[in-house]
Amino acid sequence: MKETDVLKKLEIDEYYYGDFGKKYLSNSDISTLLTNPLALGQPQKPIPAFLVGGYFHTAILEPEKLNKFKIVESTTRNTKAYKEISGGELCLLQHEVDKIELMTEKVLNNNVCRDLIRGINIEYERPGITELEGLNWKGKADIINHDEKLIIDLKTTADLNKFKWSASKYNYDLSLIHISEPTRPY
């Protein structure tokens, strides 16, 4: 398959995150390779922080897809109501959604952020592929601002003072390598 055809296919979430996309390593595989290589390729258990981050990503980049998230009006994930409504699925809590909506509003009401994110010559969720050290990698640039020649990778954190440790824990530095290489527009 030609690279252009692969990239076109990877633009579709079902392919990017499904069997087709699993032919390529991605940032989620980096931690597994570093901490438990035998678990490579096994599904990862979803965690609330990643669900919250995913909702923020979607709110900024693809707000038309927010309805795919299941939201439960509950104070915690331990309540009887949450367990009944969620059916064992990891769901967002309403107060988490409220917080993310406020964050999204703050980001988009900031002139600098809004212009970088919603400018004229912008691409969202642009996939790329590359070979590094004989391995095939995929990456997806959240935002490419061609006018400013920027690749923007959105991140969330529960505690800004601990962000540098989160960046290390989740290998954000390494994710930037495989995001920027395959999607480098310049």
How does the language model describe each region?
Residues 139-165:
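Conserved catalytic cores of phosphodiester-cleaving nucleases, focusing on short active-site segments
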Residues 1-139:
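Metal-dependent nuclease catalytic cores that hydrolyze phosphodiester bonds in DNA/RNA
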Residues 168-176:
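Gly/Ser/Thr-rich active-site loops/lids in small-molecule metabolic enzymes
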